[in-house]
Structure formats: structure tokens, C-alpha cells
């Protein structure tokens, strides 16, 4: 569900006026610690479209990847289960 979730989240962002949001792997190729989606400056986006999620593990992954990018971006996790709305969780 990774690719499908990333595409779905990017479409949601664009439909809400964030026109620059794209799936990283589709837009510029997936590189190690890259955000799952790009186009929200200063935010490192980890997308999880799963039924069972450890939010702490996902936040830690986003934090590690954001720190490795050395750009000062804020780590967030965009997540949802089937038949639910998207949620955003961030760690500061």
C-alpha cells in the first residue's frame, strides 16, 4: 500500500491547494532518507497507509530520516486506515 498511500496523500494535498506536493519516488526518484512526498517546504513527510500502525515507530522513522537530510525539516506522519480519514501526527 506504500505507493498507493503516497499517491493518495499527494492528491489530497493538491486538492486542498498545496499544488506542489508530489510523491518523491514519482517526482525525483526515491533516495534513502527522502521524504515520501515533496512540496511542503520545511516538512519531512512519512506516509503510512496501513491497518496496524505503531505511531511511535513511524514518528521515529520520520525523525531519523529528517535528521539525516540535514535540512531542519519538521518530521510528520500522514496516516490512515481503510474507511477512515487522513490524520497527521508530528513530533517536535
Segments the model singles out, each with a brief description of its role:
Residues 1-92:
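Catalytic phosphate/metal-binding cores of nucleic-acid and nucleotide-processing enzymes, i.e., regions
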Amino acid at each position: 500500500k506504500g505507493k498507493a498511500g503516497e499517491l493518495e496523500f499527494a492528491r489530497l494535498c493538491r486538492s486542498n491547494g498545496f499544488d506542489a506536493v508530489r510523491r518523491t519516488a514519482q517526482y525525483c526518484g526515491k533516495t534513502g532518507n527522502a521524504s515520501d512526498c515533496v512540496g511542503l517546504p520545511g516538512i519531512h513527510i512519512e506516509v503510512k497507509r496501513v491497518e496496524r500502525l505503531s505511531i511511535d515507530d513511524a514518528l521515529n522513522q520520520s525523525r531519523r530520516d529528517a535528521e539525516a537530510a540535514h535540512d531542519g525539516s519538521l518530521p510528520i506522519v500522514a496516516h490512515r486506515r481503510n474507511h477512515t480519514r487522513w490524520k497527521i501526527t508530528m513530533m517536535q
